[in-house]
């Protein structure tokens, strides 16, 4: 049995190495809303000087980072299909500057817009799309609403956490309880992480769907019925406000798509190829 497991590990490693051989990655720093953002630019192998290709901006979720498996698999598969990507850490996350306690959805939206401007300046950048998981999905949807279809050619949302506004109104975020009408300056979460009171104050009246509905381009929403963090009905509502969208409800899939990750990556990349290539 151990030999079988070892063979599986070796095969998985070889697959990752082969993916890496088909793409080029470069770590960069982008000026964000409260400091520098750590980012990775990944381009398809064989992209020649002067040639353009589509670029997808990949946004992680609350307490996540750009190096998550979902983000990595998506970027790798995009590169295999001739599409570049830029994945980055929001302020207060991963390797990016700024305290986690200073992070809010509005300043993550500002981060996303600054990353968009960076991507637009890349010499190889063609059409630009956005994808985001959880809170990153909310940020992607609102950023696309602000920038419009002329600038964002398609959007993919994975378990978009639009519940965050209702959580703030109820006074409960990620299991932490507080007075929503008078939140403390810091709310303890996990380990040493503390959520800032400004996060709650801004989330309380955040116009998530109102801003997102301004986006008129093609969109894809993927959500699981087993999501215990964000009920899939929040994903369904995006489908209702976006006429040019498709909705994939995955039976029993959890918030992180732990058992459905490859299926989610395949759906995501197939949709992006269809709308960008």
What label would you give each PLM region?
Residues 34-37, 138, 145, 150-237, ...:
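The alpha/beta-hydrolase serine catalytic core
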Residues 51-61:
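Short beta-strand element of the alpha/beta-hydrolase
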Residues 66, 93-125:
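Catalytic nucleophile-loop/oxyanion-hole region of alpha/beta-hydrolase
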Residues 132-142:
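Glycine-rich nucleophile elbow surrounding the catalytic serine of serine-hydrolase chemistry
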Residues 63-75, 90:
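The serine-hydrolase catalytic nucleophile loop
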Residues 123-134:
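Alpha/beta-hydrolase fold nucleophile elbow
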Residues 23-50:
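N-terminal cap/lid segment of alpha/beta-hydrolase-fold proteins
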Residues 75-97:
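Conserved alpha/beta-hydrolase
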């Amino acid at each position: 049995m151990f030999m079988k497991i070892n063979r599986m590990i070796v095969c998985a490693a070889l697959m990752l190495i082969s993916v890496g051989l088909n793409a080029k990655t470069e770590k960069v720093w982008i000026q964000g809303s409260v400091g520098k953002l750590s980012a990775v630019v990944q381009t398809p192998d064989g992209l020649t000087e002067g040639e353009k290709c589509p670029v997808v901006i990949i946004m992680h979720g609350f307490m996540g980072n750009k190096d998550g498996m979902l983000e990595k698999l998506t970027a790798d598969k995009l590169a295999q299909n001739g599409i570049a990507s830029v994945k980055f850490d929001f302020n207060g996350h991963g390797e990016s500057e700024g305290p986690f306690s200073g992070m809010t959805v509005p300043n993550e939206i500002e981060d996303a817009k600054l990353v968009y401007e960076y991507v637009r300046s890349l010499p190889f950048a063609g059409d630009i799309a956005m994808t985001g998981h959880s809170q990153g999905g909310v940020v992607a949807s609102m950023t696309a609403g602000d920038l419009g279809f002329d600038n964002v050619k398609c959007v993919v949302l994975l378990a978009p956490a639009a519940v965050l506004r209702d959580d703030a109104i109820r006074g409960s975020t990620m299991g932490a309880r507080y007075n929503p009408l008078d939140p403390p300056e810091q709310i303890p979460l996990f380990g040493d992480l503390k959520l800032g009171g400004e996060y709650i104050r801004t989330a309380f009246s955040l116009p998530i769907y109102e801003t997102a509905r301004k986006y008129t381009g093609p969109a894809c929403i993927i959500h699981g019925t087993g999501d215990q963090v964000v009920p899939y009905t929040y994903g369904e509502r995006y489908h209702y406000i976006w006429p040019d969208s498709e909705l994939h409800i995955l039976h029993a899939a959890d918030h992180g798509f732990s058992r459905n990750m490859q299926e989610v990556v395949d759906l995501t990349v197939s949709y992006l190829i269809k709308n960008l290539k």
